[in-house]
Amino acid sequence: GKLIGTPEYQMTAPVWMRGILGDQYGIKSNEIRWRSGGQEEAGRDERTPFEAPPGLDLEPIPEDRTLVEMFEAGELDGLTTAREPSSYTMRKPNIDRLFPDFRSAEKEYYRETGIYPIMHLMGLRKDLAEKHPWLPGSLYKAFVESRDIAYQDLAKTAALSVALPWVAA
């Protein structure tokens, strides 16, 4: 029954984080008490409305508080966020990663499962694909071309231009 903060329970990164914790470590989402709210700024509104399913303990934090502030005060046991909290980057006492050697843990997870956690995906409505049969293939080609341009840009600099954790692996 740990108390864990997250900007939005339904955000992409916390979704796959919960999946990994469940699949790899047997920690079920409904065994955790969840609190949602602004990570660094108070009063954050959810971008996507979400109603927690029965059995899930999910409540918003007070509007005048932030997740980081509550975490630093010991009112939350942990955070699941897409961005490092300032309390971690500022090396506040008693604040650390769940996996201190996270790069090795991430690589090992990929080696074991073959899964690279995604952030976003694109979908196409079936009625549009049926009405315009050329559309799925054209969208696919556009994304492949975009990816190829991005890969070319990666080779142009001596410093990483993206935050892909395993780009050098």
Segments (PLM) and residue ranges:
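An extracytoplasmic/periplasmic, membrane-proximal ligand-sensing/linker region
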Residues: 152-169
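Ligand-binding cleft/hinge of the Venus flytrap
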Residues: 16-61, 68
